[in-house]
Amino acid sequence: MAASLHIILDTDPGIDDAAAIAAALFAPELDLQLMTTVAGNVSVEKTTRNGLQLLHFWDADVPLAQGAATPLLRPLRDAAYVHGESGMEGYDFVDHQRQPLAKPAFIAIRDVLMNAPEPMTLVAIGPLTNIALLLMHYPECRFNIHRLVIMGGSAGRGNFTPNAEFNIAVDPEAAAHVFRSGIEIVMCGLDVTNQAVLTPEYLATLPALNKTGGMLHALFSHYRSGSMQSGLRMHDLCAIAWLVRPELFTLQSCFVAVETQGQYTAGTTVVDIEGRLGQPANAQVALALDVDGFRQWVAEVFACAP
């Protein structure tokens, strides 16, 4: 099958990001044109190093641009306590000479968008700082964005604070700007990503699958060793899965606002499922997932990798 959907991936690798990057590279329906990094799971220097390591591991001819080192207005709160000090503990990647592009991520994204023959799809699986910077500096670029698919947010409980999901909570101001931008947004938040669980039985097959499976198994074992026995949530993979298999997801058009001021609620995505606020919808929010179909797709795409 010829690749039909050209995408830009903004990411903060991060162990679960590695699985999403694999899918973006090897799902036959996708053509990854640019990868950009942002501070999130760990510092941007580390997410950039990790992204370059992954591209070298797969010998992927994809340019990478380093992005924002800090949120727009706040100090960075990372997740090194989950992903390890380097962000991808658990696998020994070989040395390489790859370097990022000599321009920041938001400019690299602008350049790819403006040179594309038609509007492109952006996929953001980390904090939305780079996307906000793009829209703030080059608001005209929104007409060159077909759609933004994000892993972030929640219509219910959070995973970083009681109400806020990590990617949004790291940079609420950036997320608020993006949701107000008028671009088409598909939000794959915790409502579906908490359902996207790979079984211990499947995880145990990864080392024998291919070199990608071996690498991911090593990362996953370090990332969530207990989950290797109970099942592992694949948060970031959901954004890639929606691009390829949207029929697996149940979406609802909603107005989504991002809280930036609350002492206890900053970073919360207020998802107006019942339309109580009387505001026009600004996002398609994924609320349910065909879990068996998702697992089948993951197995298929990982088997396509080297």
From Swiss-Prot:
SUPFAM superfamilies assigned to the protein according to its UniProt record, in alphabetical order: Nucleoside hydrolase
Catalytic site: H235
High-level lineage: Bacteria, Pseudomonadati, Pseudomonadota, Gammaproteobacteria, Enterobacterales
Record-stated family: Belongs to the IUNH family. RihC subfamily.
Gene Ontology annotations of biological process type: purine nucleobase metabolic process; purine nucleoside catabolic process; pyrimidine nucleobase metabolic process
Class of this enzyme: hydrolase
NCBIfam families to which the protein is assigned, alphabetical: PRK10768.1
TM stretches of this protein: none
EC number: 3.2.-.-
Name listed for the protein in its UniProt record: Non-specific ribonucleoside hydrolase RihC
Function: Hydrolyzes both purine and pyrimidine ribonucleosides with a broad-substrate specificity.
Any one Gene Ontology molecular-function term assigned to this protein's record: purine nucleosidase activity
This protein's GO CC annotations: cytosol
Superkingdom per UniProt: Bacteria
UniProt keyword annotations, A-Z: Glycosidase, Hydrolase
